């Protein structure tokens, strides 16, 4: 099996890279990841990297033929020719790769793993031309792939409505095995994780800095906002910008926070950051859009709010009742950890859709 991504999966510091690494870990043996990356070389025998000097669409497009050639050399003599295309980048890269692999390796089974409905995001944040091209190519990718997946039943319904294409469910999931949390709290802080370069994250981070934190620090002068993910250069008196951090550090930051606040107004797919927080036993405050597609055991917590005043009031209550709320969600984290276990989800997906390729399933 060949996995292909058009973004770096190492270091493992983004939601999409977390999902890919977890999926790869629990996929049956006989596998390799092919990626386009601008980051320094990592010694990993299971990773084939096509390097670019700088992460730009043009540089990626120019390197696609080389990436396809590397995949071809790997799959050509394989008994089980399976290509998983991780669709967490511009759809053009996925379309180009699928189109040519289908022609040079006709017996290769191509699985398109959709992380979101990209045309929705492009419609909101890109110009009209890019949106139309994206929608056309996304439709073609769903049509020509042998199997396409979605991350939630909500996305599944949307894709059928937009493209009249049936998809298989392969939820975003994580691997929390052997994760050790250090219970250490020096300051009180809220946390938001995600690159500022991604427009939905930018809007959420700006909302926290301009609408939420100025009100909260009137009652809690020492309260901080911790952000991770990189791309942010602004200064605020309450802000602690951690940039890109390791998964170990990230999970400790999430667990020890007063809460993770995710005021997303727009987005597609399911938020790995929220799945991680719920599975770690952290308190989550989110908009309806932020928590969309996630199967909740119960609410309050997590708290689902869509306007400024309720968000501020709820965070105030969380800070005042932290220990009580943490105790309440201690059992809930077991539910989320099992429900969104990549090991369980991958095993189930293969048994339902690829059992003819993998006898052990």
List each language-model region with its residue ranges.
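Short hydrophobic beta-strand element within catalytic cores of glycosyltransferases
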Residues: 273-276, 283-287
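A charged, aromatic-enriched C-terminal amphipathic alpha-helix characteristic of glycosyltransferases
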Residues: 323-355
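Conserved acidic donor-binding segment of nucleotide-sugar-dependent glycosyltransferases
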Residues: 301-309, 317-323
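Carbohydrate-associated surface elements
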Residues: 154, 170-173
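Conserved catalytic-core segment of nucleotide-activated headgroup transferases in glycan assembly
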Residues: 19-20, 25-26, 175-178, 184-248, ...
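N-terminal subdomain of nucleotide-sugar transferases
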Residues: 1-41, 78, 215
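Membrane-proximal helix-turn-helix segments that form the acceptor-binding/catalytic region
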Residues: 72, 99-103, 112, 118, ...
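Acidic donor-binding loop of glycosyltransferase active sites
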Residues: 146, 255-269, 280-283
């Amino acid at each position: 099996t060949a996995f292909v991504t058009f973004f770096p999966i190492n270091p493992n510091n983004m939601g999409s890279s977390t999902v890919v690494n977890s999926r790869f870990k629990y996929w049956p043996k006989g596998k390799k990841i092919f990626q386009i990356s601008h980051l320094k070389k990592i010694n990993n025998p299971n990773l084939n990297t096509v390097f670019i000097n700088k992460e730009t669409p043009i540089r990626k497009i120019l390197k696609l033929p080389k990436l396809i050639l590397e995949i071809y050399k790997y799959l050509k003599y394989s008994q089980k020719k399976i290509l998983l295309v991780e669709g967490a980048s511009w759809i053009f890269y996925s379309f180009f790769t699928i189109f040519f692999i289908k022609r040079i390796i006709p017996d290769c089974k191509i699985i398109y793993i959709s992380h979101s409905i990209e045309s929705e995001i492009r419609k909101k944040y890109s110009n009209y031309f890019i949106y139309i091209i994206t929608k056309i190519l996304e439709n073609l990718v769903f049509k020509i792939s042998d199997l396409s997946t979605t991350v939630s039943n909500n996305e599944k319904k949307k894709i059928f409505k937009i493209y009249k294409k049936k998809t298989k469910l392969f939820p975003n999931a994580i691997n929390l095995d052997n994760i050790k949390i250090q219970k250490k709290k020096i300051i009180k802080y809220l946390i938001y994780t995600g690159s500022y370069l991604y427009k939905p994250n930018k809007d959420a981070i700006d909302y926290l800095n301009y609408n939420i934190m100025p009100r909260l620090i009137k009652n809690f002068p020492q309260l901080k906002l911790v952000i991770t993910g990189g791309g942010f250069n602004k200064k605020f008196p309450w802000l602690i910008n951690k940039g890109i951090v390791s998964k170990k550090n990230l999970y400790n930051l999430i667990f020890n926070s007063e809460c993770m606040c995710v005021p997303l107004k727009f987005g597609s797919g399911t938020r790995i950051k929220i799945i991680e927080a719920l599975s770690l036993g952290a308190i989550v405050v989110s908009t309806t859009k932020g928590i969309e597609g996630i199967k909740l055991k119960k609410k309050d917590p997590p708290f689902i709010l869509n306007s400024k005043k309720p968000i501020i009031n709820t965070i105030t209550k969380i800070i005042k009742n932290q220990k009580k709320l943490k105790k309440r969600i201690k059992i809930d984290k077991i539910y989320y950890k099992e429900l969104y276990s990549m090991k369980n989800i991958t095993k189930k997906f293969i048994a339902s859709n690829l059992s003819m390729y993998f006898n052990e399933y």
